Amino acid sequence: MNLLIQNGRVIDPSQGLDEELDLLVENGLVREMGRGLTAPAGVEIVDAAGCCVVPGLVDMHVHLREPGLEYKEDIESGSRAAVAGGFTSIACMPNTKPVIDNKALARYVIARGREAGLCNVFPVGCLTAGSKGERLAEMGELKEAGCVAVSDDGRPVVNAELMRRALEYARGMQIPVISHAEDLSLVGEGVMNEGFTSTELGLKGIPRVAEDIAIARDVMLAEYTNSPIHIAHVSTSGAVRIIRNAKLRGVRVTCETAPHYFTLTDDAVRGYNTNAKMNPPLREADDVAAIRAGLSDGTIDVIATDHAPHHLDEKDVEFNVAANGIIGLETSLPLSLALVEQGVLTMSQLVERMSCCPSLILGLERGTLAKGAVADITLIDPTLPWVVEADKLASKSTNTPWMGQEMKGAAVATIVAGRVVYRR
C-alpha cells in the first residue's frame, strides 16, 4: 500500500522536525517528505489536516497474557488494543504461563504477532530461568530467537550477585535488562501505598522506600559493572531523585513511568476500588509532581503503559486479594497528551517519550520518519473527545480506573510498514 499523507503537522524529534509537511510512503518505507508533494498514480491520499503525524508509538511494557492466560488477553486482542491506542510496536513481558524463558516460546510469541497482522510484537525474555531468581536464563538463545530485552517483570531479582552477573552478561550480549525494582521484605503483605489513605482504609501499606532501595541497588550495580539498565514503572519521588543523580554521574540508566503514576494518587483507592490497585501502587501528590518533573527534565525517558489486563472475576473481589494492574493501551495517549496541554511536555518531547526513546532503548530501528525508514506512523488528533466505554474497548479486559470518563485526544490512524491497520 502506497500513501501520501497530506496537511499534517509532522513531529519527528529524531530529525528535529515540527512543521506542516506531506509524507510519501512507498513499499512500506518513508520515501519522501516535503511541502506540496504530488501523489503518484495509485497512491492513496490521507488527509491529516488538524492532526499530528508522528513516528509510530512504541510501548515497551505490556502484558499480553499469551501463552496460558488467554482468558485475560491474547496476542491478537492485545494487538487490536495497541493499534487503537496508536501503538505500532509493543514489547510483551514474559510472565505468562509458562514464562518466556526459552527460544521456542519467544518464537511462538513472534509468530502469533505476525499472525495477528496488526502491530509489531516483540517478546521480552526472562532474566532468570523460570523467572525464579535462582540462575540466569539463556540470554544468548533468547536474543537469537528475537527477544529485545530480558526481565523478570512482576517480581524483583532478590539476589544481588545474580543481578550483577545478569548485567555483565547482558552487556556482553548487548541485550537490555529491565528491572522490576522492589524490596520484598519491605513490601510484605502491603496492598497499596503506605500513608494516610492506607491507614484510613485499614489496608496494609507498601512504603515508598521499598521501591527506592531496590532502584538504588540496581543503579549501583549498573555503575559498578558499567552496564546499561532500564528501570520499569517508576512511581516515587525518591526513585526519580536517585535516577536523576545517577544520570548526572554518567551511569547508563534509563527508566519509564506509566500514565497512572503522573495522573492518579492513592486517593483513587477510596471505596476500595480494585481498578486502582497495581504494583507499584499509586502514590501521593508529591510523587505525582516528581514524576511529572522527571518527565519534563528528561530524567524519565519513556512513557509505557504496563498494560495489565485481568478478568472481571479477579477484580470483583475484596481489595486484599484482587489482582494488581490495569489496562492502558487505549488510554495512554490521551492521558499523556494532557501533559502537553498542561505545559509539562512539548509535543516533541511527548513523541520522544512514547516513540523515539523506547525504540532506541530496545534497538528496534523504529521511532523515526527519516527517508528510508520503516513507515510506522501514528496520526493523532490531539483534541478529539471520546468516552471510555467497556463495549468499545478492543482489549478483552475492562479493568481501568477511567471507565466512563471523557478523554481528549486519540489516534485517528495507525500505520504499520505502510499499511493502515487502524482508522478511527
Swiss-Prot record:
Gene Ontology biological process terms from the UniProt entry: 'de novo' UMP biosynthetic process; purine nucleobase catabolic process
GO MF annotation: an example: zinc ion binding
Any Pfam family: Amidohydro_1
EC numbers on record: 3.5.2.3
SUPFAM superfamilies xref list: Composite domain of metallo-dependent hydrolases, Metallo-dependent hydrolases
Reactions mediated catalytically: (S)-dihydroorotate + H2O = N-carbamoyl-L-aspartate + H(+)
Top EC group: hydrolase
Keywords: Hydrolase, Metal-binding, Pyrimidine biosynthesis, Zinc
Cellular component, GO, one term: cytoplasm
Cofactor binding summary note: Binds 2 Zn(2+) ions per subunit.
Signal peptide location: none
Active site: D306
Ligand binding (Zn(2+) 2): D153, H180, H233
Function: Catalyzes the reversible cyclization of carbamoyl aspartate to dihydroorotate.
Classification via PANTHER family: ALLANTOINASE
Protein name per Swiss-Prot or TrEMBL: Dihydroorotase
Organism lineage string: Bacteria, Pseudomonadati, Thermodesulfobacteriota, Desulfuromonadia, Desulfuromonadales
